[in-house]
């Protein structure tokens, strides 16, 4: 059985930047499966302007498990919808994991994408500026 890392990525696009697409959508949610020990990353699911719910997420995990993948973790940005999904799965600071629906004796660990968060902070500082008092 292959070990994989299930990566949940929420991408937000501005309409004017997407020159190849002129539809009514403001964002797209994409889920990728990525190898933990193998070098691959494959998109497995996407929907426009959609919030991924607990049942739908667990169905995707079960489908990946049925295909022979051993799902061991999920990573995502800290969008409110992702925090809500994590909470619905029972993820907390003390227990950053939840039981794998296909293998209840195993856990799936939940990670937030720190590099993405640092990029958001950088962009906020560039866009909004900052004040250094006393200098």
What residues fall within each predicted segment?
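Histidine/cysteine- and/or acidic
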Residues: 1, 51-135
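Folded interaction cores of globular domains that provide primary macromolecule-binding surfaces
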Residues: 1-22, 73, 89
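Sequence-pattern detector for short linear motifs
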Residues: 6, 15, 37, 83, ...
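Proline-rich intrinsically disordered, low-complexity coils
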Residues: 6, 11, 24, 43, ...
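Electropositive, glycine- and tryptophan-enriched low-complexity nucleic-acid-binding patches
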Residues: 13-70
